[in-house]
Design a protein with these regions (language model features):
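Acidic/polar, glycine-enriched structural segments that form the non-catalytic walls/loops
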Residues: 1-111, 143, 147-151
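Aromatic-rich carbohydrate-recognition surfaces in CAZymes
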Residues: 114-118, 122-169
Length: 169
């Protein structure tokens, strides 16, 4: 589900399920989009009240808070490589608490990389630098198992993935 809010009125709308074509006279259009796995109403609630610049500052501050948990000293290239890698480890799994259409328990995390790989890399790192998030991720996996009878090796879009051969932790 999605909710689109535009600062410019549009006079026509066409579409067939997977796309929409909006016709507007303005050269610049500011659009806010809220998405939800649950409902249109939830998508409306997920549209931020902040403007673009304020939302950008909010996101930068949130990422700075996470990335600053580890301080390194190196040259510019080394720092860029390290913090880019750290950023990538923090992207997934995604906290989708309140967005699970199948059961209401929280926390709910989705979009897992293959766990057989991450249990020996990013999971220990998260245990050290963000233990509350790691606890919530593990509880979310346990809830997935309780409700679906299968511990996912990978998961995306509320669906378990059976992507890797072998066994994980």
């Amino acid at each position: 589900f999605f909710c689109l809010q535009s600062d410019v009125p549009f006079h026509g709308l066409t579409g067939k399920g997977k796309y929409a074509w909006l016709m507007m006279q303005a050269k610049e259009v500011n659009v806010k989009v809220g998405i939800s796995f649950v409902s249109i109403e939830k998508a409306r609630q997920n549209v931020t009240s902040r403007g673009f610049e304020a939302q950008q500052r909010y996101a930068e501050k949130a990422w700075e808070c996470l990335l600053s948990r580890i301080q390194i000293t190196g040259n510019v290239m080394q720092n860029r490589m390290f913090y880019t890698a750290l950023y990538h480890t923090m992207l997934m799994p995604v906290d989708r608490s309140g967005e699970n259409p199948y059961w209401p328990t929280t926390p709910y995390y989705d979009d897992y990389y293959a766990i057989w790989d991450t249990y020996r890399t990013s999971s220990p790192l998260l245990t050290l630098i963000d233990p509350d998030r790691q606890r919530d991720i593990i509880n979310s996996l346990l809830n997935i198992y309780r409700h679906e009878g299968y511990m996912p090796d990978a998961r995306s879009g509320n669906c378990n993935g059976r992507t890797q051969g072998g066994s994980n932790a």
